[in-house]
Amino acid sequence: MALDDIHTPVLLERCLELLAPALQGEGAVLVDATLGMAGHSEAFLDALPGLRLVGLDRDPDALAIAGERLARFGDRVNLVHTVYDGIGRALDGLGIGEVQGVFFDLGVSSLQLDRVERGFSYSQDAPLDMRMDGTAGLTAAQVVAEYDELELRRIFYDYGEEKLAPRYASRIVQAREVEPITTSARLVEIIQQATPAAVQRAGHPAKRVFQALRIEVNQELSVLARAMPAAVDRLAVGGRVVVESYQSLEDRIVKRELRARSTSTAPVGLPVELPEHRPELKLLVRGAELADQHEIAQNPRAASVRLRAAERARRRHA
């Protein structure tokens, strides 16, 4: 199967349009913090012959596929196995200080969803894993088995925004006392049995629970909250950051960081704005951009995307 059949990059032309002005110089460095199968990065490298790419991913399978896809670019590409909050350490390891661009395409990748054995999908039976890096960390089965009812309720509320969190947490605890919950099909069955018929008609009842478990297993929100400031800190003046998020919890973190850094810190009433109070960032899009209907028809994954972008306007003063 061709790679483009597995994953079509979302808003590719718009991302390139936003990043390209900062990446024209020979040797300009772009960090793709969520490399995946490198669909975006391959296009960036093709369009910008002087570009150097640093690709980060926590998933060894994705890195292997990306490595093959980008092999033709030779030493213009460096790949690093790390979570994206490790951007600073990754750049230090390569001897790179400032960069001209950082790109994030957040959420679970098509590769991970399509690999049934990874357990991300509630529509196919598989071991309850959900780790983006299958070589390390807590599995979803362990969360379901070991977290108490209050902890399960918390993550379903906080990470899934699930109104039926108390009901689902209670039923899971009851069910695991009878036998371990080790597969996605068994978890879906428990959730469906606990869901009122009227709610089931509104959409798949397991969607938010699976999202919450995935976020908890991979610590996605806490990682993003560390990664955003780390990425901005590495941008050279004139450098740009572009972020694609796919659910409101991620987008809030991105919005908060970009808004804070694009706002003057001058005290109220100060007659003159001092240089150290000027915004570090200039926003490049108004609010969050969404995909149009044509893009969504071509690539259904784009339906939920929210794109934000900013340019580094000044260095942070000590």
UniProtKB/Swiss-Prot annotation:
<dbReference type="InterPro" id="IPR002903">
    <property type="entry name" value="RsmH"/>
</dbReference>
<dbReference type="InterPro" id="IPR023397">
    <property type="entry name" value="SAM-dep_MeTrfase_MraW_recog"/>
</dbReference>
<keyword id="KW-0808">Transferase</keyword>
<comment type="similarity">
    <text>Belongs to the methyltransferase superfamily. RsmH family.</text>
</comment>
<keyword id="KW-0489">Methyltransferase</keyword>
<protein>
    <recommendedName>
        <fullName>Ribosomal RNA small subunit methyltransferase H</fullName>
        <ecNumber>2.1.1.199</ecNumber>
    </recommendedName>
</protein>
<keyword id="KW-0949">S-adenosyl-L-methionine</keyword>
<dbReference type="GO" id="GO:0005737">
    <property type="term" value="C:cytoplasm"/>
</dbReference>
<dbReference type="GO" id="GO:0071424">
    <property type="term" value="F:rRNA (cytosine-N4-)-methyltransferase activity"/>
</dbReference>
<keyword id="KW-0963">Cytoplasm</keyword>
<feature type="binding site">
    <location>
        <begin position="38"/>
        <end position="40"/>
    </location>
    <ligand>
        <name>S-adenosyl-L-methionine</name>
    </ligand>
</feature>
<feature type="binding site">
    <location>
        <position position="57"/>
    </location>
    <ligand>
        <name>S-adenosyl-L-methionine</name>
    </ligand>
</feature>
<comment type="function">
    <text>Specifically methylates the N4 position of cytidine in position 1402 (C1402) of 16S rRNA.</text>
</comment>
<dbReference type="Pfam" id="PF01795">
    <property type="entry name" value="Methyltransf_5"/>
</dbReference>
<dbReference type="InterPro" id="IPR029063">
    <property type="entry name" value="SAM-dependent_MTases_sf"/>
</dbReference>
<feature type="binding site">
    <location>
        <position position="105"/>
    </location>
    <ligand>
        <name>S-adenosyl-L-methionine</name>
    </ligand>
</feature>
<feature type="binding site">
    <location>
        <position position="112"/>
    </location>
    <ligand>
        <name>S-adenosyl-L-methionine</name>
    </ligand>
</feature>
<dbReference type="GO" id="GO:0070475">
    <property type="term" value="P:rRNA base methylation"/>
</dbReference>
<feature type="binding site">
    <location>
        <position position="91"/>
    </location>
    <ligand>
        <name>S-adenosyl-L-methionine</name>
    </ligand>
</feature>
<keyword id="KW-0698">rRNA processing</keyword>
